[in-house]
């Protein structure tokens, strides 16, 4: 038990533990994003515009499966954090084994479905026929390694639920560098195109999963369940599915909205598709720390809810919002100032239109980043207290507002590419209008403080 007691967030200072928990979480997810970013940069530079469009247009489909998995793990981790905060280790061990078995089964089924249905799904979102062969090859290879994605997310979320965000980072950093090396080898040296990029991603994720499992077996006694890994507790499954499915539905709702937006973008030509792929990668890097600050708040609040420390929950929430604000201001300065340099990473020298479109978008979106910072902080609060339905409904409101805005601006009014940033802002405002009254009500009802 001594291996993880130091990660107990129910006592001591608030700011320093919250920041020290958040930083490895942010770094870990940024390194994870380098998987797809490396695909985009290397494929765009060494294979071409159409290959970059193929990778980008398949990414939202891939993300639906990945975010279903991470959503289930995230929902289960809220329960784990509360059980750990309450020192209920027997229930915690059964929670861990039940989540693992259910997640593995889901991953296998989803992988088989996508191996069979890759082409029809791509046509459903209006991917041009010329891009389908490369996009389908990329998808099939990625889905063959979906079990690795689940196992790493499961093991990492379990450690984070106990307050340990540093250990998953160490494995992920190694895996990220291997992925970049693999991209260079398979794409640049062997010239395997988008298929080589997908192979590099799967291999790196498999290694990350393996290293994480070995470490847990040797270093974290609480998670060495032995035969208990095969315990499937039906009584816990219901609550796990409730929390996990709500969180997963939230993630899928977000990606379905992105798919609809992608289907609109796909009608605007290959250059616009490539620019959209590039700015989405930048947005992913920008949003990830905001999301991770919210996840750190979730772990902090859930552990303290299990321990019954309501005043500490309130202070943790306020501290988390302050961190979100400081980060968003710094983000604006970086994206605004470096937009041209950022876009040249994703396009060949001759793709001036792609670079120009991306710069106009980034200059506009950069000053709006404070809004997702606020929404992620509020969502961290509701996840931490166990009210995941609010996070689901608010995400739906966000994507509904964004999709409507995209259709009006792009399809009806024929506005320029940068108007996608205004659509994002509209979605965030709708989301906050839904969340803030519920937050005030929850505070008044004594959920914390």
Regions found by a protein language model. Name each.
Residues 34-37, 46-49, 83-86, 161-162, ...:
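Helix-loop interface residues and adjacent transmembrane-helix termini in multi-pass membrane transporters
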Residues 64-67, 179-183, 208-213, 285-288, ...:
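Hydrophobic transmembrane alpha-helices of multi-pass small-molecule transporters
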Residues 40, 49-52, 89, 118, ...:
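Membrane-helix interface/capping residues of multi-pass secondary transporters
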Residues 1-22, 80-145, 189-245, 301-368, ...:
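Short alpha-helical transmembrane segments in multi-pass integral membrane proteins
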Residues 37-40, 112, 154-158, 177-185, ...:
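Alpha-helical transmembrane segments of multipass membrane proteins
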Residues 73, 142-160, 168-176, 197-210, ...:
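Short runs within selected transmembrane alpha-helices of multi-pass transporters and secretion channels
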Residues 25-78, 142-149, 238-304, 324-332, ...:
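Transmembrane helix-bundle signature of multi-pass secondary active exporters and lipid flippases
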Residues 52-112, 149-168, 275-339, 372-386, ...:
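Small-residue-rich hydrophobic transmembrane alpha-helices
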């Amino acid at each position: 038990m001594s291996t993880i007691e130091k990660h107990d967030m129910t006592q001591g200072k608030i700011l320093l533990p919250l920041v020290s928990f958040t930083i490895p979480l942010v770094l870990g997810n940024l390194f994870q994003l380098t998987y797809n970013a490396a695909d985009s940069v290397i494929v765009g530079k060494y294979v071409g515009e159409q290959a970059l469009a193929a990778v980008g247009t398949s990414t939202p489909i891939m993300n639906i499966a990945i975010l279903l998995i991470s959503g289930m793990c995230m929902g289960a981790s809220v329960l784990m954090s509360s059980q750990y905060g309450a020192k209920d280790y027997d229930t915690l061990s059964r929670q861990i084994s039940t989540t693992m078995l259910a997640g593995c089964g889901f991953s296998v089924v989803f992988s088989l479905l996508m191996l069979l249905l890759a082409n029809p799904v791509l046509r459903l979102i209006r991917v041009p026929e010329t891009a389908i062969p490369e996009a389908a090859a990329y998808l099939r290879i990625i889905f063959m390694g979906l079990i690795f994605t689940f196992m790493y997310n499961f093991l990492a979320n379990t450690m984070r639920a106990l307050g340990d965000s540093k250990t998953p980072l160490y494995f992920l950093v190694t895996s990220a560098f291997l992925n970049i090396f693999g991209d260079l080898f398979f794409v640049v040296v062997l010239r395997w195109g988008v298929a080589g990029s997908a192979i590099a991603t799967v291999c790196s994720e498999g290694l990350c999963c393996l290293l994480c499992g070995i470490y847990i077996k040797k270093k974290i006694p609480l998670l060495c369940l032995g035969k208990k890994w095969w315990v499937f507790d039906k009584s816990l499954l219901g609550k796990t599915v409730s929390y996990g499915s709500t969180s997963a539905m939230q993630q899928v709702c977000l990606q379905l909205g992105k798919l609809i937006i992608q289907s609109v973008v796909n009608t605007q030509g290959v250059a616009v598709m490539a620019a959209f792929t590039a700015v989405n990668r930048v947005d992913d890097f920008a949003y990830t720390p905001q999301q991770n600050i919210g996840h750190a708040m979730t772990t902090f609040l859930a552990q303290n809810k299990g321990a019954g420390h309501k005043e500490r929950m309130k202070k943790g929430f306020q501290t988390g919002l302050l961190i979100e604000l400081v980060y968003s201001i710094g983000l604006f300065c970086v994206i605004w100032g470096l937009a041209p340099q950022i876009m040249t990473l994703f396009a060949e020298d001759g793709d001036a239109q792609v670079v120009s479109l991306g710069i106009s978008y980034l200059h506009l979106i950069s000053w709006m980043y404070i809004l997702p910072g606020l929404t992620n902080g509020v969502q961290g609060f509701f996840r931490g207290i166990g009210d995941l339905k609010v996070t689901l409904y608010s995400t739906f409101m966000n994507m509904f507002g964004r999709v409507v805005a995209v259709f009006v601006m792009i399809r009806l009014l024929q506005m320029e590419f940068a108007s996608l940033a205004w659509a994002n802002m509209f979605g965030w405002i709708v989301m906050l209008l839904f969340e803030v009254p519920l937050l005030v009500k929850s505070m008044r009802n004594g959920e914390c403080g």
